[in-house]
Amino acid sequence: ADVAAMSYANSIGQEVHLSTQLNISNVEALKFYARFADVVVLARELNLKQVHEIYQEIVKQQIKGPKGELIRIEMFAHGALCMAVSGKCYLSLHEMNASANRGACMQICRRAYTVHDKDSQIELDVENQYIMSPKDLKTIHFMNKMMDAGVRVFKLEGRARGPEYVRLVTECYKEAVKAYCEGTFDEEKVAVWDERLRRVFNRGFWDGYYLG
């Protein structure tokens, strides 16, 4: 998300992907940053209708990156999700002096917490100790809708994950994209991918904000 770093990457011919930390959620912001990058990771808070509207504007207005090609949309498809608004969380920086916007998030939100009333110090009854830790994102069951919305690059969690996790998740989503392109994406295949994805580490799954 550093303009100087993006400019330098452009000068040496390095492809740039705009991070979700930029919180790009509308066409005007995208048009500004398109001069630096060929791929944009839109804000995680967008639903597929909003993503599709941005995609339509990319095509309509011919919004292109440094390579002269239409800028491609990248979206999170699987894995851990931040509990905060994209690019706006400073919890890790405040507590550990490690900035999430510099790729150094210490995931303070994943820890277990007890909640106390500030005045009385009475502990509140909270169902789950992990009060800031959301479930993991899984989109393979509506991958076809993401493709239809204009998503062309799928972002899979890999940081701090073991090789088996990375291999299996990548394999499943690669098969799903191939099935979509070949016209063979169906519920039977989705059920198989779902079962395989549940074998590796997860915190339970949800659809993110995509389906509204």
Model-derived segments and spans:
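Surface-exposed amphipathic alpha-helical tracts and adjacent flexible/coil segments at the periphery
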Residues: 15-17, 31-34, 39-212
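N-terminal active-site wall of soluble small-molecule enzyme domains
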Residues: 1-32
